[in-house]
Amino acid sequence: MSHTIVTEKCIGVAECVNACPVSCIHKGEGKNTINKDWYWIDFAACIDCSICIQVCPTKGAILDKEEPSLQRKLR
């Protein structure tokens, strides 16, 4: 199972990108609905290590489950 970044809660800090050991977190195009940069997780590459959840400053922005409907890849 993979993790999910909730697109509309992401504030674009990108601590998850730097912390991910397999580089499966990517920047999305444009801004989300709160006018912030946003990131998405490649479900196929995620190793479910939970480091992204630990470093994310926004509670609830990264879920410990795969929820494609909450995470978009492109704007």
Swiss-Prot record:
Free-text comment on the cofactor: Binds 1 [4Fe-4S] cluster. Binds 1 [3Fe-4S] cluster.
**Cofactors demanded by this protein:** [4Fe-4S] cluster; [3Fe-4S] cluster
Q: Which residues form the 4Fe-4S ferredoxin-type domain?
A: 2-30, 37-68
Q: Principal place where this protein is found?
A: plastid
What is a single molecular function from GO for this protein? 3 iron, 4 sulfur cluster binding
Pfam families annotated for this entry?
Fer4_7 (PF12838)
Residues noted as binding [3Fe-4S] cluster in the record, renumbered to the chain: 10, 16, 56
**Organism superkingdom:** Eukaryota
Record-listed [4Fe-4S] cluster binding positions: 20, 46, 49, 52
The name of this protein is: Uncharacterized protein in rpl9-rpl11 intergenic region
Ordered alphabetically, the record's keywords are: 3Fe-4S, 4Fe-4S, Chloroplast, Electron transport, Iron, Iron-sulfur, Metal-binding, Plastid, Repeat, Transport
Q: Which taxonomic lineage is given here?
A: Eukaryota, Rhodophyta, Bangiophyceae, Bangiales, Bangiaceae
